[in-house]
Amino acid sequence: MPSSSDELIFFVNGKKVIEKNPVPEMNLLFYVRKVLHLTGTKYSCGGGGCGACTVMISRYNPESKKIYHYPATACLVPVCSLHGAAVTTVEGVGSIKRRIHPVQERLAKCHGTQCGFCSPGMVMSIYTLLRNHPEPTPDQITEALGGNLCRCTGYRPIVESGKTFSPESSVCQMKGSGKCCMDLDEGCSESTKERMCTKLYNEDEFQPLDPSQEPIFPPELIRMAEDPHKRRLTFQGERTIWIMPVTLNGLLELKASYPEAPLVMGNTAVGPGMKFNNEFHPVFISPLGLPELNLVDTANSGGVTIGARHSLAQMKDILHSLTLEQPKEKTKTHQALLKHLRTLAGPQIRNMATLGGHVVSRPDFSDLNPILAAGNATINVISKEGQRQIPLNGPFLERLPEASLKPEEVALSVFIPYSGQWQYVSGLRLAQRQENAFAIVNAGMSVEFEEGTNTIKDLQMLFGSVAPTVVSASQTCKQLIGRQWDDQMLSDACQLVLEEIRIPPDAEGGMVEYRRTLIISLLFKFYLKVRRWLSEMDPQKFPDIPEKFVSALDDLPIETPQGIQMFQCVDPNQPEQDPVGHPIMHQSGIKHATGEAKFVDDMPRINQELCLTVVTSTRAHAKITSIDVSEALAYPGVVDVITAEDVPGDNNHSGEIFYAQNEVICVGQIICTVAADTYIHAKEAAKRVKITYDDIEPAIITIEQALEHNSFLSSEKKIEQGNVDYAFKHVDHIIEGEIHVEGQEHFYMETQTILAIPQTEDKEMVLHVGTQFPTHVQEYVSAALKVPRNRIACQMKRTGGAFGGKVTKPALLGAVCAVAAHKTGRPIRFILDRSNDMLITAGRHPLLGKYKIGFMNNGKIKAADVEYYTNGGCTPDESEMVIEFIVLKSENAYHIPNFRCRGRACKTNLPSNTAFRGFGFPQATVVVEAYIAAVASKCNLLPEEIREINMYKQISKTAYKQTFNPEPLRRCWKECLQKSSFFARKQAAEEFNKNNYWKKKGLAVVPMKFSVAVPMAFYNQAAALVHIFLDGSVLLTHGGCELGQGLHTKMIQVASRELNIPKSYVHLVETSTVTVPNAVFTAGSMGADINGKAVQNACQTLLDRLQPIIKKNPKGKWEEWVKKAFEESISLSATGYFKGYQTNMDWEKEEGDPYPYYVYGAACSEVEVDCLTGAHKLLRTDIFMDAAFSINPALDIGQVEGAFIQGMGFYTIEELKYSPKGVLYSRGPDDYKIPTVTEIPEEFYVTMVRSRNPIAIYSSKGLGEAGMFLGSSVLFAIYDAVTTARKERGLSDIFPLNSPATPEVIRMACKDQFTDMIPRDDPSTFTPWSIHVS
């Protein structure tokens, strides 16, 4: 092996980079962040699944003389692969210092950024699209964003910012109506009498896009690419070598010398294997520049040959061109491939992954290989021994040795034949979400008929994601040859394929019965498609399928979302410089979009800084018998291993354990940490820590197991009104049931991050941390280090999303990090990778709800007895408070005169669940709405009618005896029903359902009464500190944390109004325990409420001090008044304080005033469900939210939309999977699916309804959490659709539709002849792969 390296040459943002010692194992993300210090490109998942690290890569093709720009996830791009390429990061697009690019400006001004962590990736995806298509269509914009995740905004404003570049995007966004969206047909409601606005930004402010001003591709790289004397390059690393051949013969010689070396082109298979499966390769071969791998040959009349180096995106373009050039009958395989190429992964991965790599790696989940095999494709391979063709068929995909490439062989190209006149080819798939998700089951099928007949001449069926490899139903196909394509053939085919493809009951991936059902459901779809095609070929000979079956043919479409946001216009008499009530851009919006907003891990490396990684328990409940750290300590770069023995103070604080000692109580509990000079060294050393255990019984994983063992974290909480037992004796009907609601992962884009810096004096320590509760971090670090809190400073500028997940968890992790910093005496950077973040920090509490409801024939509920149990995990965390909130909020919007509610948090051997947006309300109210739906079914009424009958209608007392006025609730409910055209659309859906057997539409409207703040008054207080400087500028600090919700922006608006100065005068640096001590958490939707009051108080104090000077010089300027005040020795600094809402709750008396006010709302959602697959599409959502007076409508609407989409994900596609032994499987974006841009409503309308709330700052309301529950309107719309399907099939319309309503849950509820056909296994004979923990 060569001992020296060649120089790696590439460009980054127009600047030449010459790397003399390139490291083959280093990726581009690490390189730009840690070597080039370009921190705008973010680390979020590390596996190419989230898009936060998106960059643009540009390459020159010397054959075509063209420059190709494409998006790529930097975390998967080996830096050595970039020789001769140009990389553009977000810093290269534009900056505040240089020039803001129109993409960055519009993303910020359209309010497409909240926490800002995903924003650079969004910018790069749109920017790359514009470099290739300066005037994109709306569909291209949606497609370009398909690989980017955002947890804050709900995507709508991001898409809207992109659509401003599209000439097809009109001002009015109502589609197909032929009239303006503001022409409301259904009467005038109270809100329409108010002056309502619909524009959150001014398009006239946007600078135009000028493609001619974009940076040119470096001419030097063109010369390099065209150099006829190129030579082989070798990059030598510490453990590995990277070789780039420049000729085909050179490649074949290398493959002969290193037959096991992987060919790295896109790195989308090799890279994840190294990161997640600990695969190691001493040699990499990268044949990126070989023209033989880049060919496209359409000269062969039998088909097309596509070079193995072509990316999947290039393949898509090639196939699309062919479908335009060739007759439709010849391109059926191409069309099937194109359908899957639209949804396979995201655009970044499609532009990186290559055809050759995808085919040869043969993933079991491949969406393309089954179609290629069904279309009789072949692979052209070559070695030093010569060329040959390998059929891309079942034996190849099943990895049979005789059908596979030899180790020394290289795939040159793939030949895709044209389809025959009497051949039909189709690809089918179903995934947890429409795009960027591995298929749960996919298939490639083709059939060829004897000419002019429906007699099967040849048949191929291949299925993915049902076995360790793609499998071919070859025996089934053989038996069906010669048969007629009719219903009997279908019935036999289903039986045969189920016998041939057996999914074991304990198969990896679970969902066994569902996957069995999908196999034959997809086969049925194929059968219908072929029937329809035959009918088109000869309508006289081949009858068409029944009209009611036609909708089963097509997948649910991907549409570009659009909508309207309505809010109250600002009073025209309000002073121009007063920003309150205006839709002002997030104060860091531009910095988010340029990547200049700094997060913790963006901070420069400190001298002697160490990186920290964790070693966690692999057992749910066990005694630790030994910990051997010797091998880890000996690893290069390791400074120390930290254990419980190193904690100088409390290792168990308030029930939270920092380092496990003697015993572990969950999988994922931190046992020790490794501190090393680099993250790579720390991570590798952590793998070498050896821990032995003795299991302890029982290991309690589920709620039911906890109930069986009487294992609880808290005492029972209860409220009761009326006489429940008596009422049950005097009702017409009683129903009982239970609902399981699974948990939810926060999936904030920035994982938990801490930088702990020990000081040289007085045992002081400074922590930079992403948190919602700096005081809590300070408390835990103080306890762990055994020093007073005044020695611990916690500083927090911003964090990349939180949603409750950064209330308590940063305190525990901060203590862990601080102990390491204390022991080593060096700064410690502690950044959890996504896998460990999901494993350690847990999320929303799973819940089991049991109900008994008594009601009258007319639907009036007279009595309810409800029990709630949550899975709290292994330590207290916030579980007791969550169960209190669940019990208090459990009535939602309904007055039930005899009501009993009890709740208890279960103790299990799972990582401790914690705060999450809505804090128990989203789980509890699903149970409420479920029993409302059950009552409706029993009474043969619409659920909306039952909701109306039982809703609070006048000033009333809650079950805990707090008085409130439901008028805003009634208003939101009525406007939602009216303006969503619910009853007309419901009727239209019923008509659709009559005419379509396999697809059903459903609608639901849910009301909401959501309480704000905390029942303990001391948690509602706040403080602020305001300084006025002599130039008139104002520095503002307060105790709240900027999480993306725009809290700092609102505080600047408050200060601007109170001091009567332009908002540009006010600056806000960070939140710190030094400037504002003892601050409470930023949660409970009360950040702006309480901190706004504190800022207001401080500003009013300052203005009062200035009043004598202002009176003497009323026409003077602000700066003059400030200067005069200083000269008169008037203090220009003031603290502000808000005592807090005086809330209380007496649990012994079961009464109190626990909440200062309520937020009301209603949402109507319409879905379409595919009963054959379980897929659903959200067609439209209308939200009416009681906003009172919005301080900033843009921010508040952003919170409502973002919460709704997060809630929709919680109730539909987000699914945490655990093994029976308590191991979390869902540890990254590949395994846990949050909504993408394709999941949001096709039509999305949000109206902010005006009301009064004099108790709060400017009569506003906290809207951060309320929208979460409204996402359940999607769940109950699905329930409505499934109920219709079940009724049509003669099944009961009362059934448990648990949450989340995943495709599996939906499909298995839509029972039919196919679900009846699948074999069932005896549960006592196997251990399932995964279990539910609710």
From Swiss-Prot:
EC id: 1.2.3.1, 1.17.3.-
Cellular component per GO, a single term: cytosol
Gene label: Aox4
Classification via SUPFAM superfamilies: 2Fe-2S ferredoxin-like, CO dehydrogenase flavoprotein C-terminal domain-like, CO dehydrogenase ISP C-domain like, CO dehydrogenase molybdoprotein N-domain-like, FAD-binding/transporter-associated domain-like, Molybdenum cofactor-binding domain
Catalytic reaction annotation: an aldehyde + O2 + H2O = a carboxylate + H2O2 + H(+); retinal + O2 + H2O = retinoate + H2O2 + H(+)
Record note on quaternary structure: Homodimer.
Lineage: Eukaryota, Metazoa, Chordata, Craniata, Vertebrata
Residue ranges of domain 2Fe-2S ferredoxin-type in the record: 6-93
UniProt main location, coarse: cytoplasm
Cofactor note: Binds 2 [2Fe-2S] clusters per subunit.
Cellular compartment(s): Cytoplasm
Leading EC class: oxidoreductase
Name of protein: Aldehyde oxidase 4
Gene Ontology terms for molecular function: 2 iron, 2 sulfur cluster binding; aldehyde oxidase activity; FAD binding; flavin adenine dinucleotide binding; iron ion binding; molybdopterin cofactor binding; NAD binding; protein homodimerization activity
